[in-house]
Swiss-Prot record:
Homodimer. CDD domains: RPI_A. It holds the Pfam family Rib_5-P_isom_A. It comes from Bifidobacterium longum subsp. infantis (strain ATCC 15697 / DSM 20088 / JCM 1222 / NCTC 11817 / S12). This is Ribose-5-phosphate isomerase A.
């Protein structure tokens, strides 16, 4: 699948997911290449159809994109609930376990998700896998002592790599933390790994989102299809 085909599937999923946002809602808006198409469609509906809703974003770049369309964006602490959050995912399996954080927004994404009545992910078909872990698992760590955290990950066999930008500088999250990517190839026991990571001093959050999502909208060549989590 080339990039143009992949983008077409992402766009289709984003447009389908935008239908979930209705007048008067408080909607969580995620981060990433697929969410960009979602926000474009919500912006179109706002400007052309008069859709009025309030957004809570998981990154400053999503906030900037939404506000460019005139969409009202507020801080998460200014609302008492979020009706639905629509976000992307880097991988998701049949058990609705996922990896997120490829865009370095995992902490804000998880905060918004855990305060949402409904969580929906939008992905292209390449993101649906049998076992998560092929995509590097992002872990947000504070800069102080990050080298020691990386050494601990190395000792565990996690194959950690500090994420750098195109200029060779450390990627910083919106909270000014570092991102360490774990190259695990596959994760057979995600719950155990999640507990191990979050209990590591210096770790702020990890990109394992386990059985959190209610629905996954998959961009498919035959049209968007929906995976519904029966356990939610």
């Amino acid at each position: 699948m080339d990039k143009a085909q992949q983008d077409a599937l992402k766009k289709a999923a984003g447009i389908e997911a935008a239908k979930l946002v209705e007048n008067g809602m408080i909607a969580g808006l995620g981060t990433g290449s697929t969410v960009k198409f979602l926000v474009d469609e919500l912006g179109r509906r706002h400007q052309e159809e008069g859709l009025e809703f309030t957004g809570v974003t998981t990154s400053r770049r999503t906030q900037a994109q939404a506000e460019s369309y005139g969409i009202k964006i507020v801080d998460i602490d200014d609302v008492d609930h979020i009706d639905v959050t629509i976000d992307g995912a880097d991988e998701v399996d049949k058990n609705f376990n996922g990896i997120k954080g490829g865009g370095a927004a995992l902490l804000w994404e998880k905060i918004v998700a855990t305060n949402s009545n409904q969580i929906v992910w939008i992905v292209d078909e390449s993101k649906v896998v049998d076992t998560i872990g092929k995509f590097p698992l992002p872990v947000e760590v504070i800069p102080f002592g990050a080298g020691h955290v990386i050494k601990k990950f190395e000792a565990c066999g996690y194959k950690p790599v500090l994420r750098l930008d195109a200029d060779g500088k450390e990627v910083r999250t919106d909270e000014n933390n570092f991102v360490v990517d774990l190259h695990l190839e596959r994760i057979d026991h995600p719950q155990e790994l999640a507990e191990d990571l979050i209990n590591t001093v210096g770790v702020v959050e990890h990109g394992l989102f386990l059985n959190m999502v209610d629905k996954v909208i998959v961009g498919d060549p035959n049209g968007p299809r929906v995976m519904t989590n029966a356990n939610k």
